[in-house]
Amino acid sequence: MSAKQLGDLKPLFIEWLKDEIDACGPRQEKMAMVYFRARESLKRFDQPITETAKVLKVKGIGNSIKNKLASKLAQYCQDNNIPLEDAAAPSHVVGISVTRVRTATQEKDDQSPKRKKRKYVPRKRSGAYAILLGALELGCPSRGLTKEEIIDAAAKYCDVSFVSNPLTREFYSAWTAIKVLIDHDLMLEQGRPRRYIVTEAGEQMAETLKHADSVIFPEDCPYQRRQQAPESTAEDHTELSASLSELVRQEHLPQNHSGMCFSFEPPSSAPSDYLDPGQKSANVASSPHRLRPPIGPSIDIVKARWNGTSYELWKPGSYDIELYIDHREVRAKSERDFFVNALLTRGVTVEGKALALGDMVWVARHRDSRSTCVLNFMLERKRLDDLAMSIRDNRFMEQKNRLKKTGCKHIFYLVEETSGTNVAGMEGAIKTSIWMTYVYSGFHVKRTRNADDTVEWLHDMTCTVQRYYCSKSLLVLRPREIANQEDYGSLLSAFRLQFERNNTSLECCHAFDCYQEVLGKTGLMTVKELYIRTLMLNRGVSLEKALAIQSKFPTLRSLMTAFRNCKSEEDGRRMLYLALLDQPASRRVGKALAATLWDTFGRR
């Protein structure tokens, strides 16, 4: 039998990649993750693999893995007495047969020594250089790092800003270098929200850059902690799957290890899910999970997993409350930082951010890890004229629906009644909208006289939030994969149902980076949501009208097909008007709006 008769080589390659994963030791988690991602991508690859070179078409497989598979195929052919020249594998073998038909001149040219491809080395103080050093400073954890974590650590090593500014025609930032690092297999991107993992080659490159330029990291950074305790890093300790009551039990923990994070050493077959948090767990000493204090300094965070989702447990007093304000929230063009500066003078820890949703949100920042999570308090601020405009152009309902997706328990809608605001003719609509926000949406409505009054209220509210959380533990969710924005809220609800039902001293919340990536206007949108937003870009199309159109024409293609099937332009202009005549008044499309939608989607 020849190797050609093997047919599709994919099953063999999948098996060999599994062997590589199993061969990785406990200190080779990153390499195991590379092989795992390559194996999963190969499983999903729908074309047969008839030669080794074809695996380069598979996402996550580069020359290194291809060469390893080629070597294994050569060994397999040798062990099974299969002629190697028939094997549809190594690309260099195929190249030999091609060379035989070349002319003598070409063969002479080929004999000249080929220039070796230069290894990629990031330029000093460039974006790629800074990203690698920032990730190394953070310890290159196997769980990966978020974009925000990397930028916070990397900014000082780069001469270019990590934030683009289209107003000054700076369309690219230093962060775009992450694509170069991924292309050179120095970093991996995975999951949603996205996390970035430094590969073994990337870590070696970062170490080389650090020593070449004599870069000195801060004494308390994760890299230094890992150097002091190489066998047990604070960031990469084992996640436990057990009952929550066992995790938070204080009286059984050794007193001489206060302030440390106790990792749990699971048995050979750990339970897949958490037990009921309300049930009594046995003494930790008699538990099948043995407490193992880490070596050297560590961080006071318990990491665990429930129902396939990782989470962290932050104890009371281990975190601080901060207020994030969207940097687009301004008092006037000449006072863009008014709210941040005014609150800073009142002793409030506040920071301007580009928030994905909401105008202000209260977050908790862990004192040791410096990671942040979104608390159950957020605020949408509207000046009276802005509120009137949002009602008129249908942004009001859309914004409220997006706020509901957060699953936040306490959403405040603050209306600033600035003097001299012209809302003539909108008084009734404003009153109705405020009452609907309070009664039907369940939001807290707060009315202030002006921006100064808003600042005073924010100061008092921040103090209230700090008192509320002074004795609460936080269960911070860190999901690896969220399919859409609905999953964000449903996952939070599932955790609350499991952990908060009998425990008033604990609250579940998402990590801030997850909040930022998932809840953006264009983040993780379904086709249906994108279709509805496309309809709402037309002036006069409210959320109710867009939903009514979507119920009659489920997809944009079906709507455009219906327009094309109209016999005349006049029929096309009246089609949506006639199709929605049986709908309630708020969901109907008038003749003028129907004509506008025809001009947008139907006119050829």
From Swiss-Prot:
| GO annotation, biological process | DNA catabolic process; DNA topological change; double-strand break repair via break-induced replication; mitotic intra-S DNA damage checkpoint signaling; resolution of meiotic recombination intermediates
Q: Which domain of life is it from?
A: Eukaryota
Instruction: Indicate what this protein is called per its UniProt record.
Output: Crossover junction endonuclease MUS81
Q: Which Pfam families match?
A: EME1-MUS81_C, ERCC4, MUS81-like_WH
Ranges where the ERCC4 domain occurs: 322-419
Q: Where is this region: Disordered?
A: 268-290
Q: Provide the top EC class.
A: hydrolase
Q: Which organism is it from?
A: Eremothecium gossypii (strain ATCC 10895 / CBS 109.51 / FGSC 9923 / NRRL Y-1056)
Q: How does it associate, per the subunit comment?
A: Interacts with EME1.
Keywords for this protein = DNA damage, DNA recombination, DNA repair, Endonuclease, Hydrolase, Magnesium, Meiosis, Metal-binding, Nuclease, Nucleus
Question: tRNA processing: present as a keyword of the record?
Answer: no
List the EC numbers from the record.
3.1.22.-
| Localization annotation | Nucleus
**Which co-factor is required?**
Mg(2+)
Family affiliation = Belongs to the XPF family.
Protein purpose: Interacts with EME1 to form a DNA structure-specific endonuclease with substrate preference for branched DNA structures with a 5'-end at the branch nick. Typical substrates include 3'-flap structures, D-loops, replication forks and nicked Holliday junctions. May be required in mitosis for the processing of stalled or collapsed replication fork intermediates. May be required in meiosis for the repair of meiosis-specific double strand breaks subsequent to single-end invasion (SEI).
| Matches recorded under PANTHER family | CLASS II CROSSOVER JUNCTION ENDONUCLEASE MUS81 (PTHR13451), CROSSOVER JUNCTION ENDONUCLEASE MUS81 (PTHR13451:SF0)
Read off the InterPro entries from this record: DNA_pol_lamdba_lyase_dom_sf (IPR027421), EME1/EME2_C (IPR042530), ERCC4_domain (IPR006166), Mus81 (IPR033309), Restrct_endonuc-II-like (IPR011335), WH-like_DNA-bd_sf (IPR036388), WH_MUS81 (IPR047417), XPF_nuclease_Mus81 (IPR047416)
User: One GO molecular function term?
Assistant: metal ion binding
Cellular component (GO) terms are: Holliday junction resolvase complex; nucleus
Q: Does the keyword Nucleus apply?
A: yes
